[in-house]
C-alpha cells in the first residue's frame, strides 16, 4: 500500500552533524630525509618557513570542516531564529489582541460606570432642584403665617378694649388663644423643617460633587483607554517608555476600585432617597399645617359669628326694654303731673272748708253749736286731708317709680352702649380684619 504523502508547510530543519562524526584521515608526519634535506647542516633544529603538502591538505580539510560546521550552526540558528521570530510575532500579536480586548472590556466597564454616575448626577441635580423648590415653599409658608399671627394678636388686643360687663373670657377669646398657640407651633415646625431642607441640600450637593469628580475621572480614563485601544503597530504617536511597565504604589486593585465606585453610588442613592422622603414629608407638613390653620380660622370665625349673634340678640332685647321703659317713663311723668294736678285741685275745696270752719268758729255764745253743718264741714276737711295724703303718697310712689325707671333707662342705655361697642369691635374691627386671612394656597407655600 502506498504511503500517504505529507504536505510540508515549511522547510524542515537541517540535521546537525557533530564534528566528531566527520571522517578523520590519519596523517603521518613526514621526515625530511630526502636528497635535498638539510639534515646535518647548520640549520639543524630549525623548521623551514614552508608548509608541507600534507599540512596544506590537513589545513584545507580543517577549513572545510570548520566552514561546514559554521554553516550548519548558522543554518540551525537561522531556522531557530525564524521560528523564534514567528513565535514571538504570533505571541506579540496574541498579547496585543488580548490587551486590546482587555482595554475594550475596561472601556465597557468604564462606560457603564460613567453612565451610572451620569444618571445619578442628573437625578441628584433634579432632586436638589426639587428640594430647593420645597425649601422655597417652606419659606413662603413661614412668611404667610405672620399675617394670621398678627391678625390673631390684633383681635386679642382689640377685644381688650371691651367694657364691663362684656370684658369676659368667652369662647371667642379661647379660640383666638388656640390660634396664636397653633401658629407659634407651626412656625417653629417650619423653621426646623427649613433647617433640615438646607442640610439635605448641602448633602445632595456634596454627594453630587463627589459623583462629578468620580465621573470626571472616569471620562478622563475613558478617553485615555479609548486612545490606547486605537493604537496599532502603524500608529505614529507611539514611542518607547522603558519605565512605564511597573505598577504604581498608589494604584488600586479591581476589587477596591469596584468597591469605591459601588460605595460612592450607594451613598449618593441613599442621600437621594433621603431627599425624596424629606420632600414627601415637607408636602405632608405643608398640607397639614395649611389645613390646621384654615380649620382654626374657621373655628374662630364661627365663634365670632355666634358671639356677634348673641350680642345682636342682647342688644335688640335691651333696645326693646329701653323703648318700653321710655314709654313707661312718659306715662309715669303724665301720671305724676295728673297727681300733682289732683293735689292742686284738692287745695281749693280744702281752703273753702277750712275757711268755713274758721268763720263758723267765730259764732257767738250759744250759737257756737255743733250742728250738722259743723259736723259735715269737719268730715269734709277730714276727707279732703285723707285724699291729699293718699294723693301725696301716690305721688311719692310715682316719683320713686319714675326715678327707678330713669335708673333703668340709664342702665339700659349704658348696656346698649357697651354692647354696641363690643359688637363694633367684634364685627367691624376683628371680623373685617380677618378677611385678610391667607388662603390655603398661600399657607401651603404655593403663592
UniProtKB/Swiss-Prot annotation:
A GO BP annotation: cilium movement involved in cell motility
Observed effect of gene inactivation: In a 129S5/SvEvBrd genetic background, males show progressive reduction in fertility with almost complete loss of fertility after 5 months of breeding. Testis weight and histology appear normal. Spermatozoa have significantly reduced forward motility. The sperm flagellum shows defective bending in the midpiece region which impairs waveform propagation and forward propulsion. Sperm ATP levels deplete significantly over time, probably as a result of excess energy consumption from inefficient flagellar beating.
Post-translational modification: Ubiquitinated, leading to its degradation. Deubiquitinated by USP16, promoting its stability.
Compartment(s): Cytoplasm, Cytoskeleton, Cilium axoneme; Cytoplasm, Cytoskeleton, Flagellum axoneme
Residue runs in coiled coils: 322-348, 375-423
Pfam families: Tektin
InterPro entries, per database record: Tektin-like, Tektins
Tissue expression notes: Detected in testis, where it is weakly expressed in round spermatids, and strongly expressed in the flagellum of step 16 elongated spermatids (at protein level). Expressed in spermatozoa. In the sperm flagellum, localizes to the principal piece and midpiece (at protein level). Specifically expressed in testis; not detected in other tissues tested.
Keyword annotations from UniProtKB, A to Z: Cell projection, Cilium, Cilium biogenesis/degradation, Coiled coil, Cytoplasm, Cytoskeleton, Flagellum, Ubl conjugation
UniProt superkingdom: Eukaryota
GO cellular component entries: axonemal A tubule inner sheath; axonemal microtubule; sperm flagellum; sperm midpiece; sperm principal piece
Primary site of residence: cytoplasm
Protein's job: Microtubule inner protein (MIP) part of the dynein-decorated doublet microtubules (DMTs) in cilia and flagellar axoneme. Forms filamentous polymers in the walls of ciliary and flagellar microtubules. Contributes to normal sperm motility.
Annotated family: Belongs to the tektin family.
Subunit structure as annotated in this protein's UniProt entry: Microtubule inner protein component of sperm flagellar doublet microtubules.
Protein name from the UniProt record: Tektin-4
Gene: Tekt4
